[in-house]
Amino acid sequence: MLSGHVTFVGFGLLASSMAAAIRASKLPLTIRIVSSQKTRERAKELGFADESFGYEEVESWARGTDLILLCSPILHILEMLESLQKIQVESQVVVSDIGSTKAEICKAGARLSSPFLFIGGHPMAGSEKRTLEYNDPSLFENAYWFLCPPKGTAPEEYSLLSELIAFLGSRVVLFEPEEHDATIAWLSHMPQMVSTALAGNLPEDLLNNNYQHFAGRGFRDMTRIAASGWNMWRDILLTNRSAVLNALAGFAKGVKAVENALDKLPTDGDEALHKIFESGNKGRASLFAPGRVAGHGFYEVSVALEDRPGTI
């Protein structure tokens, strides 16, 4: 059974959801949180915090713990890693993070002195909601959780982290930091920018007439993540700029192919558009094929509900 002391540095949606799951299962884990005074007070009201500290109290929160999870925005994670470089601890402390980019974070983590052990991490979970008020103990169920351990690190050295991830219902995937960043640029970061650009570039005439209210499900689905906050995404784009640019260039190439095919209609271009749609169909279907981890795939479930108050 999981036991020990876990310290969450930053206590937004993801950290509070982990704490909620731990509390709901009554695991013998001591939860320590590091955050602003307002958030610490709210976490105590919700029963999530056994101990709490301010960010500046690094001498206190870095000691007396088995696992430190850095759960703040990426640039703040880098600041916290720099602060930890100045701390000496007597026994091993595993340090991980939930940042959406890994190369720069893992380089900073590698500068920690033993017995700190840094394992870069990134759970593919979350939403456009950002605070502990939206905590969800089931948030991590069936999610992939990327880990980037230093080469030669035995899994036993970070077993508490792996056990916590398994308890939360996620599946560990080991990745090299650079490979992670290139992959997630395509699967997460570039789609965010496309969604943001789509929602932010509606024609002025359309907006002046309030025609955006006629948007169908497709537009609403494609722009849901346009509600995401700039502060978090600023850090992601600053630390994964090159990979995101490469992904955007690849996407732009696809859009250009659509433009070229449309431009040739009606005399030509029909076959080209047919192939573009076939390629899109195959790409979408590939999401639901068995995955590279234990043969798991995704499933799409549609639930028809009557549109009236109280249905959900």
Predicted features and spans:
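NAD(P)+-binding Rossmann beta1-loop-alpha1 motif at the extreme N-terminus of oxidoreductases
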Residues: 1-60, 67
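Rossmann-like NAD(P)-binding element
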Residues: 58-89, 94-96
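Rossmann-like NAD(P)(H) cofactor-binding subdomain of soluble oxidoreductases
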Residues: 80-133
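Internal alpha-helical scaffold of NAD(P)-dependent oxidoreductase catalytic cores
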Residues: 139-225
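Interdomain hinge/lid region at the active-site interface
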Residues: 208-279
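A conserved regulatory-domain signal marking ACT and ACT-like small-molecule sensing domains
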Residues: 283-312
